[in-house]
């Protein structure tokens, strides 16, 4: 997320240098998600079959390479930059499918919400880091170094990952017998011997519920990740050098609330509450809270009111780690990576049409209210659809 969000901040001086209006900025910001969409299902299938370690590691190397090439691409032209962002998105596409393939093999059912809370808390952590550090780098060394610096971090991470990670607990050289027995207490997901049943997966109402919730969740998520710095800078008049310090507040709260929400969901399950009831309660809090916040934030006239509303939205939205976020592993643990690839393909679409639509609305109307209320309406629809069709019964094994 450092490599995603740095563009959201760096694009402000880039747009001034290259003369890009909101529509062209929307094209640059949304192009990442075209590539992100393309490799989701293939990435999940490869992770399920060959292991999340190698697929995730290669993905990090790929997206770090294209992060490194971003300044060169921008200098050549807008079209080349868009292509570069698409290729970067293809590298990042394997991330969550690989993580789900790893979690299905490493984490028992009653601990998965907390595990996803910890992992997903890296989203706001990386976002905060990029929001604070990117303006500092840009003002000290130029916007180009916002990409060079973070690309180097990616290469370092990949080297460490290949050294210490394992796709399955039984293959880790330092795992204890006690820990291995605990991890496998729910039964180890069986090995995939054939292609996943794609038609049956897509026809499942429960999986459709996850897809819709994921789509609606990501409409608001990607809107904030890509346009929040511009809203703070251009919409509310905050100085560029101060953007990170204001926008970090909602994401710091997300870091805390994701870990708290995951633990709460796991405790509810351990207390005997039905898994599907927990999933629906948490998802209602998440999408319902986000919908309410998006409906009103566009009317904020001061930075502190806007940040307060965004903070509440992020805190309530974090409840999704006990909702649709882990629902894939309830339904099809054997195909967790593939299923995440399917739903995340759907969820990448808002990154293309939602991010671009926001730029188009701003160019045609200048209305931030319309941008945010569209997101709120979509969140409300997702909440209702999930309540009607979600399930936590294992359907594929």
Regions found by a protein language model. Name each.
Residues 84-124:
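Cytoplasmic helix-loop-helix junction between adjacent transmembrane helices
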Residues 7-8, 204-261, 320-321, 325:
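Extracytoplasmic gate region of multi-pass secondary transporters
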Residues 61-75, 288-301:
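C-terminal ends and interior cores of transmembrane alpha-helices
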Residues 1-22, 224-229:
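Extracytoplasmic
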Residues 276-323:
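C-terminal transmembrane helical hairpin of 12-TM major facilitator-type secondary transporters
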């Amino acid at each position: 997320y450092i490599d995603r969000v740095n563009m959201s901040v760096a694009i402000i001086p880039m747009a001034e240098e290259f003369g890009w209006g909101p529509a062209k900025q929307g094209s640059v910001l949304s192009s990442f998600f075209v590539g992100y969409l393309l490799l989701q299902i293939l990435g999940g299938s490869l992770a399920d079959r060959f292991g999340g370690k190698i697929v995730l590691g290669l993905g990090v190397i790929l997206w770090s390479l294209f992060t490194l090439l971003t300044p060169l691409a921008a200098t050549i032209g807008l079209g080349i930059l868009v292509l570069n962002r698409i290729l970067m998105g293809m590298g990042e596409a394997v991330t969550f499918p690989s993580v789900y393939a790893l979690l299905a093999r490493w984490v028992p059912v009653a601990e998965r919400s907390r595990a996803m809370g910890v992992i997903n808390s890296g989203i706001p952590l990386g976002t905060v880091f990029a929001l604070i550090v990117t303006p500092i780098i840009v003002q000290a060394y130029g916007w180009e170094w916002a990409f060079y610096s973070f690309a180097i971090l990616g290469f370092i991470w990949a080297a460490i990952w290949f050294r210490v990670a394992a796709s399955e607990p039984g293959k880790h050289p330092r795992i204890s017998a006690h820990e291995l027995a605990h991890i496998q207490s729910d039964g180890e997901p069986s090995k995939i011997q054939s292609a996943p049943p794609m038609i049956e997966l897509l026809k499942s109402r429960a999986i459709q519920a996850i897809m819709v919730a994921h789509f609606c969740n990501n409409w608001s998520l990607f809107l904030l990740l890509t346009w929040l710095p511009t809203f703070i800078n251009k919409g509310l008049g905050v100085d560029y050098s101060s953007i990170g310090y204001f926008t970090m507040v909602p994401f710091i709260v997300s870091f805390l609330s994701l870990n708290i929400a995951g633990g709460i969901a796991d405790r509810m399950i351990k207390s005997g509450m039905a898994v599907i009831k927990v999933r629906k309660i948490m998802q209602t809090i998440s999408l319902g809270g986000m919908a309410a916040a998006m409906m009103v934030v566009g009317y904020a006239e001061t930075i502190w009111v806007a940040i307060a509303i965004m903070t509440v939205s992020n805190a309530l939205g974090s409840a999704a780690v006990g909702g649709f976020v882990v629902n894939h592993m309830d339904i099809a643990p054997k195909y967790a990576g593939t299923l995440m690839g399917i739903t995340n393909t759907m969820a990448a679409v808002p990154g293309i049409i939602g991010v671009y639509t926001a730029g188009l609305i701003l160019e045609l109307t200048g209305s931030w209210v319309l941008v945010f209320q569209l997101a709120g309406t979509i969140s409300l629809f997702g909440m209702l659809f999930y309540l009607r069709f979600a399930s936590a019964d294992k359907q594929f094994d």
